[in-house]
Swiss-Prot record:
This is Small, acid-soluble spore protein O. It comes from Bacillus cereus (strain ATCC 14579 / DSM 31 / CCUG 7414 / JCM 2152 / NBRC 15305 / NCIMB 9373 / NCTC 2599 / NRRL B-3711). Keywords: Sporulation. Belongs to the SspO family. It is found in: Spore core. The keyword Magnesium does not apply. GO terms for biological process: asexual sporulation; sporulation resulting in formation of a cellular spore. Coiled coil: none annotated. GO terms for cellular component: endospore-forming forespore. The lineage of its organism: Bacteria, Bacillati, Bacillota, Bacilli, Bacillales. InterPro entries: SASP_SspO (IPR012613). Residues 1-49 are annotated as: Disordered. HAMAP family: SspO.
Length: 49
């Protein structure tokens, strides 16, 4: 049968991106300021996490 490889990683791709860590995406949007509505929502969600 050969060696079993983890099914969620795609060979030839960046391992991190294959596991849902879209690095570029996160870095791009991480520092964008919230609108007042988003800021309000963010506070509530933080408590629940």
């Amino acid at each position: 049968m050969g060696k079993r490889k983890a099914n969620h990683t795609i060979s030839g791709m960046n391992a991190a991106s294959a596991q849902g860590q879209g690095t570029g995406y996160n870095e791009e949007f991480a520092n964008e300021p919230f609108t007042p509505a988003e800021r309000q929502n963010n506070k509530k969600r933080k408590k629940n996490q």
